[in-house]
Design a protein with these regions (language model features):
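ATP-dependent small-molecule kinase phosphotransfer cores
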Residues: 24-49, 56
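C-terminal helical "lid" subdomain and adjoining coupling/linker elements of P-loop NTPases
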Residues: 148-151
Length: 151
């Protein structure tokens, strides 16, 4: 939240021609089928090339071929600034929202995987948008996917 991951995903989606699925989309899919679990929805989406943001997809899809897990991070102040702009909030409001969201994400990830959210061992690549910038992060991923012929 506030790292720019959704912006990177959108840029990749446009350049690679693959859809992006986020929390809202996955929750919408669950509403349509009361028997489906979130993991089943994510596995179904991953049968075709796509980008899945969050939702423990790194753990759910860890044994699937052609899955590449990326963790996008940024300095706390950069994240707060992005949230302030996107949500039209004060610094304190954005900071509170960020801290609440991070705590919820960490709890959700641990409850569903037994692992620590953000642990580098759960991902193939870590990208820091504070250091690299959003466009450079997207370019790094595109170059990598071209090199390993995923695209």
């Amino acid at each position: 939240f506030g790292t720019g991951a959704s912006l990177i995903a959108q840029e990749l989606s446009e350049k690679l021609g693959v859809p992006v699925y986020d929390k809202a989309y996955i929750e919408h899919e669950l509403d349509g089928d009361s028997y489906a679990t979130e993991a089943e929805v994510i596995k179904g989406l991953a049968e075709y090339p796509c980008i899945i943001l969050g939702r423990c997809a790194s753990e759910i899809l860890k044994d699937q071929p052609n899955v590449f897990n990326v963790y996008v991070c940024a300095d706390k102040e950069d994240r707060i600034e992005r949230i302030m702009k996107k949500e039209s909030l004060s610094h304190d409001e954005a900071k509170e929202m960020l801290e609440k969201n991070d705590a919820e994400r960490a709890d959700y990830y641990y409850e569903n995987t037994g692992k620590v959210w953000g642990d580098v061992n759960n991902y193939h690549m870590i990208l820091d948008t504070t250091k690299l910038g959003i466009e450079n992060c997207a370019d790094i991923l595109i170059r990598y996917f071209e090199r390993v012929e995923i695209i």
